[in-house]
Amino acid sequence: MEERERGKEKGSKGKGRKKRGKKGAGEAKEESKEEDRGEEEEESVEADVPVEEMAAGGARPKKKSPKEKSKGEEHCYKVHKRVLRWMKSAERIKYELDNGEEEKWRGRSIEEIEEQKVLHDITEVLKLLRSKECDKFFARTGKYMKGGSERWNMVGVGILEEGGKKRVGNVEVGLFEGKGGENIIYHLMFKPTDFEEEGEGARPSFGRCDGVDAIEEGRISDMSGFQYPPGVRSEITSSGSEFRIVWKNQRDTSLVLRSLTVLRIPEIR
């Protein structure tokens, strides 16, 4: 009897594995169909990015339903995979771009990818976008149709510091409405408009930030020798006038790689 039970158990496990295999093949086939229709970008998987896990001092959030907000969150957004890919290595990004649907990104050199990664790999901004303070830092545009989807943009003023240089520009956010009614971020980057000279402030230009045809922390003290916990790559600070992200070397946090400061929009009186 015991041997029979074991046989049944093995059989049931085998069936379970077969079912999972079929599901994976079906998903791959479905993605292939969407690429053929030119709609791969809209149909691809979106994700709720746990920003708290990437920034120092953040608590790991509990799993929540797509429409459920975390404590302190005002806006609920999902993130498209074309935004998340910029968190990967330059080599991996190049591979995905060369084999992707967006022709303008194909054939880029590793050097170009690394330059673009500095401008696009700013997913920590999501913490501000989801917060109640979002509208104090970002201006919204009206909705419009493009590539078969309803879209809109959000634009903020930012200063990117890297290698001793400051660049002034816009923090661009592109969104579209998913089939389930959720708001999905498909474009996120810092777009330089000028180099900041000493004694001068930001002079960004606000405009539509959409080049995609079809959607397929305060001053940081020296902590030499300190290492971030696994998965943490930045520190975030926020005040009434600015939201600051500092990216440091994960093995030695005394080495600052770059920083991005999003400035509050001046109130019009």
UniProtKB/Swiss-Prot annotation:
Residues 13-23 have a biased composition (Basic residues). Residues 1-12, 24-36 have a biased composition (Basic and acidic residues). Residues 37-51 have a biased composition (Acidic residues). Disulfide bonds: none annotated. Transmembrane segments: none annotated. Pfam families: DUF1609. It comes from the Eukaryota. Residues 1-74 are annotated as: Disordered. Belongs to the UPF0329 family. This is UPF0329 protein ECU04_1660. It comes from Encephalitozoon cuniculi (strain GB-M1). The lineage of its organism: Eukaryota, Fungi, Fungi incertae sedis, Microsporidia, Unikaryonidae.
